[in-house]
Swiss-Prot record:
The gene is for. ATP binds at L783, G784, V785, G786, G787, F788, G789, R790, V791, K807. Keywords: ATP-binding, cGMP, cGMP-binding, Kinase, Nucleotide-binding, Phosphoprotein, Serine/threonine-protein kinase, Transferase. This is cGMP-dependent protein kinase, isozyme 2 forms cD4/T1/T3A/T3B. Residues 441-461 have a biased composition (Gly residues). 3',5'-cyclic GMP 1 binds at G584, E585, L586, A587, R594, T595.
Length: 1088
């Protein structure tokens, strides 16, 4: 095939295919292009096509300066993927490198291209330059399936670097040749620095003789990575030709790259040859189209030696060329390399060599001028009319103007990046002034402490602000979420009932199938799903009616039985749903705004359930199961003397196992470490006689009976057979010895360092602040803004040596979001706490509009702000801050207080750099061994049992501790989705589904995974050794706990605090745009 243009020729040579698979691999070193003074023009006969339509000479054609990077490519194909034999071409003389016939699908690409007119090219010769040749062979195995063309590759940058280093060391060793195997395959290094090296033809490579240069290249194929794609250069007896290198999908690809000094192509070696060649194929096809257009536009244009006049081709019957009036030729100016030009510039920079038409002789052939580099191919004429010259000047002026505007735009971009760092304070004010955040009502500081995070000294949980753009940190300020508290008394829940609605079997199965198909609700127990199905009531929506409206606060979840609905967001269509689907499931967790609109396309029949009903079902089934399991355990002698909280822990880890009639639950003589309690059905106990093979019946066991208790005490040989007897099967509650030993411990083993040590200091604080009134406080500055109000830095009148954080919360907004109970709990817990890792509360005030909390000021700023600016912390820094949180948890958990809102936003630094826990709006004091069911926390940090409404306790804090470690080490939490529901689904998949970055060490990863176990009883810190098991973990080896507890350990980051009123570590905040809130005189806060 031949692809030719008016002045540029492309021709392919298709050699015969050879079946010799054992032919040796061959390669040829190509001399550098000639010097500009010695020009060789190879003339090829012109095959003139049909004359194109008349084209006006108004286009600008610039010279194409392309840096040549010669590369020889030899392609072999591995025909059989099941053998290691390569099908290669037959060995050729050293001066010839031929292509193997492309496979059919490769050949089709070429046959689709039309053959235009033949053209002529011009190459300035130059003697060879010293070079280092590095050959790297990469092997790919072809799959036999036509549909699967994915090629597996192995890349090893270190081996490439080693090859380049070896090449550099060979600069002074002529004719050196080294080969060695690597993970990439065979690597060859050849030194061609010998200027007297004789080519295969026998000519001296250092000669400037053009014929020698040509002879050396006869039959050779050299690839030139040009702007439009991979171009092949072939020298034949009729002249030099450019050919398109055939697209390759070969299984064996050998790159031989020739480098001068320095070897600048090292980076190119690291490119994946598959993607590079594919890109070059596409560019080459685009190049064909551009050259066809150019050929049509320049058909018949030529000029004579040294003449500034541009001529048409001679008219038929005439031997004289016709001059083009107003068209002149100019020497070109050097352009940028083509690969940096845009498409329009590439079109303008297509190669046009000044030449004569066939038959006019060589006297009129111009010589190139203005060559800057011998490795450049240039033509030295550009056609332009006087009018076009003016356009050129205008375009150049506009390009200069564009460059100036681009510089100004870059400056503005830098300014924008600077201003984005100040957006936190604005985005923290406006969303919460409207009473909602992130689409959730009653969120983002629903605790009331979101207005200062800490108890006052920082922006806290509810700011909703966007983080400053850091290198690796894109997470926005986390928002706290809280549902309205529910009654958690099992006695009250027993008297709560919801109506049940009749359904046919088809509807019941459809609802069940829809729930099990939902990523979130499929995690519910089957007993809970059955009750939910029973309580769902029917609703019907006519066509074109709204089922769910974006922005509304929802409390109902739907299951669609039949019909079709359209889902849209912000007026844009998202999808169409039909069949059994769950709609609006986030509403059953807490009050939240709908994130999309769902409209009935046809009449729709749905089943619905209210959030209150759903949460009651979840709580009641959990409490009933817990009470039932605890009663079972109390009937077992080895459990009857255990504390109530220990029994509840054991009941949480009991797994229900089912057996069919005739199954051997336990076999005599077998080893075992499990203990069983029968919850349903009957089993038969037998013993095998030693003198006979018959089994002797001993007795029957039923519901409430147990067996295998000796396995928990260390005896692992079974002494009897236990066989399922009931026709309906048997259900057993099972616990293994390891889990039992982790949970059972003497209470004396757990040390509580804080029992009464702070009681006296607490009384002293109360006495000191007893006479301070709200009017005695003077506001200095605002430290933070949150969901319920603001946090102000204040001083008492007449005392400038101390400062405090005054947190003020709007009473009306607390009532609106039903967070009264959380606020009272926060005041009670902080008022009793006396721990150096927890912010101290000194006194509380109230009036008709606000509640006030006077607290310790921590002027070092939020840990979240430092993390945002740094991107992430190293291992040592993360260990220090994690240890501070562990100390705070040790104090709280020893008093049965669950925190529930751990995150960097709720950790403040004092003046020394020690971290203090703040914002106790979600904290709660639990009864011994009891759980709580209120959904609250930050979406990225909530534990699975909180999401599934199974009840949670202090074990949820250990989950969030693992999440905090991950975020401090990486800059982002491990569980992050585009919306809360997606985040919850990621959490339910577990920590084992998360890919850990390399910067997290093995010990840190191990601790995170032990803290973030799906089963709360398996989490480190919740087991037998308590929180001391965390302190003893390998990640904390060598950590100076005593120095931390006594504040003698040097913190990794010491904030700059110049005075007691220095607020430079906090943002500036504007005044409240909404003004004072309305009065609240309901009296709910009489004990505040």
């Amino acid at each position: 095939m031949r692809f030719c243009f008016d002045r540029l020729c492309f021709a392919t040579k298709r050699p015969a295919q050879n079946s010799n698979s054992n032919a040796p691999h061959s390669s040829t070193t190509v001399d550098a292009p000639p010097r500009p003074a010695d020009v060789d023009v190879a003339t090829v006969p012109v095959a003139t096509p049909a004359p194109p339509p008349q084209q006006p000479v108004s286009n600008l054609f610039y010279a194409d300066y392309q840096k040549l990077q010669p590369a020889i490519i030899d392609r072999d194909w591995e025909r059989d993927r099941d053998t290691d034999t390569d099908t290669r071409s037959e060995a050729k003389p050293p001066d010839i490198v031929e292509h193997i016939e492309p496979v059919e699908e490769q050949r089709q690409i070429h046959t689709q291209i039309q053959s235009p007119a033949e053209i002529q090219i011009q190459i300035p010769p130059t003697p060879p330059a010293p070079s280092i040749q590095i050959q790297i062979q990469q092997r790919y195995r072809r799959h036999s399936s036509a549909e699967d063309r994915n090629l597996n590759t192995r890349r090893n940058d270190s081996n490439i670097t080693e090859a380049l280093r070896k090449a550099a060391s060979m600069q002074q060793e002529p004719n050196a040749n080294y080969q060695f195997p690597t993970d990439l395959g065979l690597v060859s290094i050849v030194n061609n620095n010998n200027n007297t090296n004789t080519h295969p033809s026998g000519s001296n490579s250092g000669s400037n003789n053009n014929s020698n240069i040509n002879n050396n290249l006869v039959g050779g194929i050299v690839t030139l990575p040009a702007a439009g794609g991979l171009i092949g250069l072939e020298h034949t007896a009729s002249g030099l030709r450019l050919i398109p290198a055939p697209p390759t999908h070969s299984d064996v690809l050998t790159h031989t790259l020739i480098y001068g000094t320095p070897p600048s192509g090292a980076q190119q070696l690291n490119q994946d040859p598959r993607s590079l060649l594919h890109q070059q194929e596409l560019q080459l096809q685009q190049r064909y189209q551009q050259l066809q257009q150019l050929q049509a536009q320049t058909q018949g244009l030529y000029t004579s030696q040294g003449s500034p006049v541009l001529y048409h081709q001679p008219s038929p019957g005439s031997s004289q060329p016709v001059a083009i009036p107003g068209a002149t030729c100019h020497s070109p100016t050097q352009l940028q390399p083509p690969n940096t030009l845009n498409l329009q510039q590439q079109m303008q920079s297509l190669r046009i060599s000044g030449c004569t038409p066939s038959g006019t002789g060589g006297s009129a052939t111009p010589s190139p001028v203005g060559l800057v580099d011998p490795n450049f191919i240039v033509s030295n004429y550009v056609a332009a009319s006087p009018q076009e010259e003016r356009f050129i000047q205008i375009i150049q002026a506009k390009e200069l103007k564009i460059q100036e505007m681009q510089r100004a735009l870059q400056f503005k971009d830098n300014e924008i990046a600077e201003l984005k760092s100040h957006l936190d304070k604005f985005q923290s004010v406006f969303p919460f002034s409207r009473g909602s955040a992130a689409g959730c009502a009653g969120t983002g500081g629903a605790s009331g402490s979101g207005a200062g995070g800490s108890g006052g000294s920082g922006p806290g949980t509810a700011t909703g602000a966007t983080r400053k753009s850091g290198q690796n940190f894109q997470r926005q300020r986390a928002l706290g979420i809280s549902a309205e508290p529910q009654s958690e008394s099992s006695l009250l829940l027993e008297h709560v009932s919801f109506p049940k609605y009749d359904k046919d079997e088809r509807s019941r199965e459809l609802i069940k199938a829809a729930i099990l198909d939902n990523d979130f609700m499929k995690n519910l127990d089957l007993t809970q799903i059955r009750e939910i199905v029973d309580c769902m009531y029917p609703v019907k929506y006519p066509a074109k009616n709204l089922i769910i409206k974006e922005g509304d606060v929802g409390s109902i979840v739907y299951v669609m039985e039949d019909g079709r609905v359209e889902v849209s967001r912000e007026g844009k269509y998202l999808s169409t749903l039909s069949g059994a689907k769950v709609l609006g499931e986030l509403a059953i967790l807490y009050n939240c705004q709908r994130t999309a609109t769902i409209t009935a396309i046809t009449e729709c029949n749905l089943w619905a359930i209210e959030r209150q009903c759903f949460q009651t079902i979840m709580m009641r089934t959990g409490l009933i199961r817990q009470a039932e399991y605890s009663d079972f355990l109390k009937s077992v002698p080895i459990f009857k003397d255990l504390a109530e909280d220990t029994l509840i822990k054991i009941s949480d880890v009991l797994e229900e196992t089912h057996y069919q009639r005739g199954d051997y639950i336990v076999r005599q003589g077998a080893r075992g470490d499990t203990f069983f309690i029968i919850s349903k059905g009957k089993v038969r106990v037998t013993i095998k006689q030693q003198d006979t093979q018959e089994e002797k019946f001993i007795r029957m066991l039923g519901k409430g009976d147990f067996f295998g208790e000796k396995a928990l005490q260390g005896d692992d040989l079974r002494t009897a057979n236990i066989i399922c007897e009931s026709a309906d099967g048997v259900s057993c509650l099972v616990i293994d010895r390891e889990t039992f030993n982790q949970l059972i411990s003497n209470l004396d083993e757990i040390k509580h360092r804080y029992d009464d040590e702070g009681a006296m200091e607490r009384r002293k604080i109360n006495e000191e602040f007893r006479d301070i009134n709200l009017t005695d406080l003077r506001v200095i500055a605002t430290l933070g803004v949150g969901g319920f109000g603001r946090v102000e830095l204040v001083q008492t009148n007449g005392d400038s040596s101390r400062s405090f954080a005054l947190k003020q919360m709007k009473k009306s907004q607390i009532v609106e979001t039903r967070q009264q109970q959380h606020i009272m709990s926060e005041k009670e817990i902080m008022g009793e706490a006396n721990c150096q890792f927890i912010v101290k509360l000194f006194k509380t005030f109230k009036d008709k509009k606000y509640l006030y909390m006077l607290m310790e000021s921590c002027l070092g700023g939020e840990l979240w702000t430092i993390l945002r600016d740094k991107g992430n912390f190293d291992d040592s820094t993360t260990r220090f801050y994690t240890a501070c949180v562990v100390e705070a948890f040790d104090y709280l958990h020893s008093r049965n207080i669950i925190y529930r809102d751990l995150k960097p936003e709720n950790l403040l630094l004092n003046e020394r750099g020690y971290v203090k826990l703040v914002d106790f709006g979600f904290a709660k004091k639990l009864q011994t061994g009891r759980k709580t069911w209120t959904f609250c926390g930050t979406p990225e940090y909530v534990a699975p049992e909180v999401i599934l409404n199974r009840g949670h306790d202090i074990s949820a804090d250990y989950w969030s501790l693992g999440v905090l470690m991950f975020e401090l080490l990486t800059g982002t939490p491990p569980f992050t989705g585009s919306d809360p529901m997606r985040t919850y689904n990621i959490i339910l998949k577990g920590i084992d589904a998360i890919e850990f970055p390399r910067n997290i060490t093995r010990n840190a990863s191990n601790l995170i995974k032990k803290l973030c176990r799906d089963n709360p009883a398996e989490r480190l810190g919740y087991q037998r050794g308590g929180i001391s098991e965390i302190q003893k973990h390998k990640w904390f080896d060598g950590f100076y706990w005593w120095g931390l507890q006594n504040c003698t350990l040097e913190p990794p980051i010491k904030p700059a605090v110049k005075s007691v009123v220095d607020t430079t570590n906090f943002d500036d905040y504007p005044p409240d745009p909404e003004g004072p809130p309305p009065d609240d005189v309901t009296g709910w806060d009489k004990d505040f």
